[in-house]
Amino acid sequence: MERGETPEEERQSGCVLPTSPESDSLKTSNWGFLITGVIGGALVTVYAVTTPFIAPALRKVCLPFVPATSRQVENVVKMLQHRRGPLVDIGSGDGRIVIAAAKAGFPAVGYELNPWLVWYSRYRAWREGVHGSAKFYISDLWKVTFAQYSNVVIFGVPQMMPQLEKKLEFELEDGARVIACRFPFPHWTPDHTTGEGIDTVWAYDMSACRTQGKRA
């Protein structure tokens, strides 16, 4: 009578024992957990990265991120000639206006709702050597008071300009200057305009705008 081979002898001879249904099920389950974990992690990452960009678009009045062109930055700086005092960029995006203003000698602040853009702006300010005079904060523009700023820059959209016009007229001092890019304010009359097309910049004297509003 022949002796049956032990499991160890079968492995040494190159034979493979058949796997049980329970073992196959366990392997399949492990792969399922791994795939689910990878997909879940990817979805969380995508959500974390894209939410700051998508969330503003879901608000009643949105301020989308559209980078300023080099000519727009030049036009803004041109409108700031002979000006002094702190500057604020409402919806500062990637920080290029604030950084340019800081290089021109202004203590400049940018308010931006998107945290990724704020962190990138801070890095750019550090890299370009103006992090001491260029500051960036994560905030909703409607929750910030701008009374302390002598110079205000805004890259707005048409649907928000009437509401922002009222807010600035209520908060700013008479000596303040407001610079609008891409879209003008609906009721104010600019004292200076420069540029063409999307590079157009409108400059408003706050005192003149208030006088105009009283006459109307």
UniProtKB/Swiss-Prot annotation:
<keyword id="KW-0496">Mitochondrion</keyword>
<dbReference type="GO" id="GO:0016279">
    <property type="term" value="F:protein-lysine N-methyltransferase activity"/>
</dbReference>
<dbReference type="InterPro" id="IPR026170">
    <property type="entry name" value="FAM173A/B"/>
</dbReference>
<keyword id="KW-0808">Transferase</keyword>
<dbReference type="GO" id="GO:1905273">
    <property type="term" value="P:positive regulation of proton-transporting ATP synthase activity, rotational mechanism"/>
</dbReference>
<keyword id="KW-0949">S-adenosyl-L-methionine</keyword>
<comment type="function">
    <text>Mitochondrial protein-lysine N-methyltransferase that trimethylates ATP synthase subunit C, ATP5MC1 and ATP5MC2. Trimethylation is required for proper incorporation of the C subunit into the ATP synthase complex and mitochondrial respiration. Promotes chronic pain. Involved in persistent inflammatory and neuropathic pain: methyltransferase activity in the mitochondria of sensory neurons promotes chronic pain via a pathway that depends on the production of reactive oxygen species (ROS) and on the engagement of spinal cord microglia.</text>
</comment>
<dbReference type="InterPro" id="IPR029063">
    <property type="entry name" value="SAM-dependent_MTases_sf"/>
</dbReference>
<dbReference type="GO" id="GO:0030061">
    <property type="term" value="C:mitochondrial crista"/>
</dbReference>
<keyword id="KW-0812">Transmembrane</keyword>
<dbReference type="GO" id="GO:1904058">
    <property type="term" value="P:positive regulation of sensory perception of pain"/>
</dbReference>
<feature type="compositionally biased region" description="Basic and acidic residues">
    <location>
        <begin position="1"/>
        <end position="12"/>
    </location>
</feature>
<keyword id="KW-0472">Membrane</keyword>
<keyword id="KW-1133">Transmembrane helix</keyword>
<feature type="modified residue" description="N-acetylmethionine">
    <location>
        <position position="1"/>
    </location>
</feature>
<keyword id="KW-0007">Acetylation</keyword>
<dbReference type="GO" id="GO:0005739">
    <property type="term" value="C:mitochondrion"/>
</dbReference>
<feature type="region of interest" description="Disordered">
    <location>
        <begin position="1"/>
        <end position="25"/>
    </location>
</feature>
<comment type="similarity">
    <text>Belongs to the ANT/ATPSC lysine N-methyltransferase family.</text>
</comment>
<feature type="transmembrane region" description="Helical">
    <location>
        <begin position="31"/>
        <end position="50"/>
    </location>
</feature>
<feature type="region of interest" description="Required for mitochondrial location">
    <location>
        <begin position="51"/>
        <end position="85"/>
    </location>
</feature>
<dbReference type="GO" id="GO:1905706">
    <property type="term" value="P:regulation of mitochondrial ATP synthesis coupled proton transport"/>
</dbReference>
<dbReference type="GO" id="GO:0018023">
    <property type="term" value="P:peptidyl-lysine trimethylation"/>
</dbReference>
<protein>
    <recommendedName>
        <fullName>ATP synthase subunit C lysine N-methyltransferase</fullName>
        <ecNumber>2.1.1.-</ecNumber>
    </recommendedName>
</protein>
<keyword id="KW-0489">Methyltransferase</keyword>
